[in-house]
Amino acid sequence: MKIAIIGAGIIGVTTAYELAADGHEVTVFERHAAAAEEASFATAGMVAPGSVTPWAAPGMPAKVLRSLLSRHAAVRIGRPLSAGDLAWIWKWRRACKLETYLANRARLQRLAFYSSERLRQLSADLPLEYERSEGYLMLLRSGKDLQLAQPALQVIRDAGVAFREIDAAEARRIEPALNADTALAGAIHLPRDEVGNCRQFAMGLKIGAQLLGARFLSNTTVTRIGRSVPATLYVAGEARRRRFDALVLCAGVASASLLKPLGLSVPIAPVYGYSISAHIREPLNAPLSAVMDERYQVAITRLGQRVRVAGGAEIGGAPGHKRAASLQTLYKVLHDWFPGAAQLSNGVQEWKGARPMLPDGPPVLGASGVPGLWLNIGHGASGWALSCGSARVVADLIAGRAPAIDLEGLGVERLLR
């Protein structure tokens, strides 16, 4: 089939590869000059399927309210809040019920573990270099942090993930550069989870897709999707519509505005995350793989010759404005654990990305209800961890094959009830 993909983030690129590998004629439309320029650009890089859970969870509304009083809050409310932001927050709050959370957690983890398997298969089959390393530590500063981490540990246990609860001495043996002056009560070691550069993987897989015949059209903005059969789309600056046998929407936050004229109201909201990336100044002072500070919900990862520090969740506010306090938290956590590791006097990349999040957590995969239009949207902060599996699922559905996992609750009908 002749298939168009809208969006060349990690979701669009993996989808392009899987469809091209299936023998389809694939064209990818990307509004930026290169792939993975938005939410996929400077992520933490964690691929930890056992830790992929809905943000909508019991107790989270109260936790968010308490965190707003902290200077280094993991969750922040930006200004201004639009009507859409307020509606999203209301739906998110409703999804925090225990029954809803458990169902969505099961859906996410089915997809996350399958995606991890698919990522490993692609890495074995293709010459992809993406600064990969294995294993990470969840750092617990105090006994209270260990107590607060118990719900997350139970999730990991339930998922059957291999992990060890270790003391501070063992944690420092695994990551020798951890600052001895920062209090550490213990840690959780997850040896099989991995870290990798999401954008670098996307760029490498894009080449793989191109070798299979996929075309990538950069600086090309899709302004509208038609309802006609065969499927059609309209590109900015072009008077004539383009026709395809099928369209796959992978446009992140922009997906909602493209779907609305078709009668599909999909509540995707940008939940902003932050990261800083800096060159390593002294390798002996840098992490070997990755750590997660559980108190501040900040990840520190080693990506080749750089250190990346990522965290935060910000609802509302202006897309182009970087909140100074959010960035300061990242610098603080880096200094707490790995002082002197990074060259911070110049060349630091500070990034704010809009993660396309649905209120209840899981993405939407599969048929849209509009003839010829397929969806691969709403992966939130887990796009990197879910991308390879989501792409394979959508390719299988388009081909009329049964996917390898149960897709209950991952279709668009979940949002239209």
Locations of regions flagged by a protein language model:
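N-terminal Rossmann-like FAD-binding beta1-loop-alpha1 element of flavoenzymes
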Residues: 2-28
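Glycine-rich FAD pyrophosphate-binding loop
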Residues: 21-41
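Dinucleotide-binding Rossmann-like beta1-alpha1 core, especially the glycine-rich loop
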Residues: 42-168
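Active-site substrate-recognition segment that forms the wall
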Residues: 45-46, 51, 55-94, 222-232, ...
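Helical element adjacent to the flavin cofactor pocket in flavoenzyme catalytic cores
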Residues: 147-159, 181-245
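C-terminal catalytic lobe of FAD-dependent flavoproteins
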Residues: 163, 192, 294-295, 335-417
